[in-house]
């Protein structure tokens, strides 16, 4: 028998059971520990199709619920597949689904828990991708064997970006580098491994050399494409990515981009929500895994603060105007 769990990604202990074909309504409640009043008490209705391994999500609240950054829409429905990320409201409170095989006998019940489909190879072009119903033949590598993909586990925009020579800036047998589809700065690339690794949560010491290679490739791209530019760069990971598959951000620190539109965008790169690449490598080297603190998603709500001089700014337009003073624009 197969059962389905809804698993909060920024609070590792939280799991909500979704019985087969039963409508479950969740939102702001003690069960989810969501207290944000922008999240309705009846934000979404979830109905698990355990046999087919997906969950039907209906947005009931007024404020937007999204799957892999695609907004569902009030009273509309979308399928949530293993490997995809459901944000309960306003791109906050990330959840994923896990399916678990439960083998029953007269005297004992054994459970075999499945990972949330790391093999879906769902990656990010950093926003606005549409769900795909196409399958793609994945590459394999020593850092993770890729299995046959299930239908619809890729976001169409990313698949196109990864295969599109115009988006690719570098590739080798371990990684591909693409331009971020919605760059948050003048220069913004994503370094993505071909190996199927769903998130930092599943990274182990086995992936250490891959992480080092990703960092080295990121530095190579900076050198190759910016030359003698005086722009500063940071290389790092979002603690809780908006879409599934490990990816390293390589981003210039000017943040001069029309795609930088809101507080979440800013704070995802300018608080501890952004994990430095070298810090992640050191963590894996010393502890064998990456630890993300509970409540990390709350960092996205912090006031806007200039990353250069720490001045508080009331809005994104005023922050952008302020930043021009630092880079002389």
Swiss-Prot record:
Protein name per the record: Aprataxin
Lineage, uppermost ranks: Eukaryota, Metazoa, Chordata, Craniata, Vertebrata
Subunit organization: Interacts with single-strand break repair proteins XRCC1, XRCC4, ADPRT/PARP1 and p53/TP53. Interacts with NCL. Interacts (via FHA-like domain) with MDC1 (phosphorylated).
Catalytic center residues: 247 (tele-amp-histidine intermediate)
Keyword Hydrolase: yes
Segments forming C2H2-type zinc fingers: 304-326
Species this protein is from: Rattus norvegicus
Location of region: Interactions with ADPRT/PARP1 and NCL: 1-95
Subcellular location as annotated: Nucleus, Nucleoplasm; Nucleus, Nucleolus
Residue interval(s) of motif Nuclear localization signal: 111-115
Site (Interaction with DNA substrate): 161, 238, 249, 264
Ranges for domain FHA-like: 23-72
GO biological process, one term: regulation of protein stability
Enzyme Commission number(s) from the entry: 3.6.1.71, 3.6.1.72
Limits of the HIT domain: 155-260
Function: DNA-binding protein involved in single-strand DNA break repair, double-strand DNA break repair and base excision repair. Resolves abortive DNA ligation intermediates formed either at base excision sites, or when DNA ligases attempt to repair non-ligatable breaks induced by reactive oxygen species. Catalyzes the release of adenylate groups covalently linked to 5'-phosphate termini, resulting in the production of 5'-phosphate termini that can be efficiently rejoined.
